[in-house]
Amino acid sequence: MATVSTNEFKGGLKLMLDNEPCVILENEYVKPGKGQAFNRVKIRKLLSGKVLEKTFKSGDTCEVADVMDIDLDYLYSDGEFYHFMNNETFEQIAADAKAVGENAKWLVENNTCMITLWNGNPITVTPPNFVELEVTDTDPGLKGDTQGTGGKPATLATGAVVRVPLFIAIGEVIKVDTRTGEYVGRVK
């Protein structure tokens, strides 16, 4: 297996720790006044989603995770699995609810998602950064009702609930940032 030195650690690098693929979220190189230098690393386990901090001595090596990120189009969900297709080979891959997780509310048919495969099985599904969804339910925005935050909750076509400005009405299509779950703007 390929190995990587702690000197080459950076955000996004995928490693094997305790026989489980992990991704580095943050890496901080620390050189104390006395003693050996080390890397303080924040890691997210790809299978369980747990975030933990580990320290590595400077110069140590770690095994690189044998994972593959591929872009696939979301097709549909049959209740148990979410089905994706490769546009070039037309090969279909089914991901379970554990791999999709909280991102299920951002999946829109025919949108391209990034799937992380480990041993040929999908372990994480990352939706596009921005999705366009129709508002299916929200309170009517009354004129002069601007006290407080100036926002209201809106239910989208996928079931996600997002805070939107008062002028958004049922049936409008809005753009949402899937990383934060925040309203970005109206789609014209």
From Swiss-Prot:
> PTM N6-(3,6-diaminohexanoyl)-5-hydroxylysine: at which residues?
K34
Decide whether keyword Lipid metabolism is in the record: no
Write out the pathway annotation from the protein's UniProt entry: Protein biosynthesis; polypeptide chain elongation
Q: Annotated Gene Ontology MF terms?
A: translation elongation factor activity
Q: Which CDD domains match?
A: S1_EF-P_repeat_1 (cd04470), S1_EF-P_repeat_2 (cd05794)
User: Which UniProt keywords are given for this protein, alphabetically ordered?
Assistant: Cytoplasm, Elongation factor, Hydroxylation, Protein biosynthesis
A cellular component term (GO) from this record? cytoplasm
InterPro entries for the chain = Elong-fact-P_C (IPR015365), NA-bd_OB-fold (IPR012340), Rib_uL2_dom2 (IPR014722), Transl_elong_fac_P/YeiP (IPR020599), Transl_elong_KOW-like (IPR013185), Transl_elong_P/YeiP_cen (IPR001059), Transl_elong_P/YeiP_CS (IPR013852), Transl_elongation_fac_P (IPR011768)
Please, one GO biological process term?
peptide biosynthetic process
Q: State where the protein is found.
A: Cytoplasm
Its chief place of residence is cytoplasm
Q: How is it modified after translation?
A: May be beta-lysylated on the epsilon-amino group of Lys-34 by the combined action of EpmA and EpmB, and then hydroxylated on the C5 position of the same residue by EpmC (if this protein is present). Lysylation is critical for the stimulatory effect of EF-P on peptide-bond formation. The lysylation moiety may extend toward the peptidyltransferase center and stabilize the terminal 3-CCA end of the tRNA. Hydroxylation of the C5 position on Lys-34 may allow additional potential stabilizing hydrogen-bond interactions with the P-tRNA.
Q: Which family does it belong to?
A: Belongs to the elongation factor P family.
HAMAP family given in the database record: EF_P
Q: What is the role of this chain?
A: Involved in peptide bond synthesis. Alleviates ribosome stalling that occurs when 3 or more consecutive Pro residues or the sequence PPG is present in a protein, possibly by augmenting the peptidyl transferase activity of the ribosome. Modification of Lys-34 is required for alleviation.
Protein name, as recorded: Elongation factor P
Classification lineage: Bacteria, Pseudomonadati, Pseudomonadota, Gammaproteobacteria, Vibrionales
